[in-house]
Amino acid sequence: MQRGDVVELRLPKGVGHEQRGHRYGVVVQSDALLPRSVVLIAPTSTSAKDSTFRPEVDILGERTKVLVEQVAALDIGRLGDHVARLHGEAMWSVDDALSTVLGLN
């Protein structure tokens, strides 16, 4: 597993606006901290509203938003198959959005 990998998520029933159901997630944890039993993941959504801090990327031919404001530490048991990897501009847009939501700009 590497930073930028897109994996299937097995999420529990969420509360309120927490993500749930079948979706993908982007590994945003540093490669220096992998592998671990818990990994930082940004979930994705094809139906989330547009926002300046939600980068839109292509995953398996479908445009999807990376919900960087909902990054979570997930046990690796909640991670399914590796389906893709974000490279170049797509990963840069995730990094830039993470900087914005974490106040690192």
Per-region residue spans from a language model:
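Conserved functional hotspots at enzyme active or ligand-binding sites that engage polyanionic ligands
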Residues: M1-N105
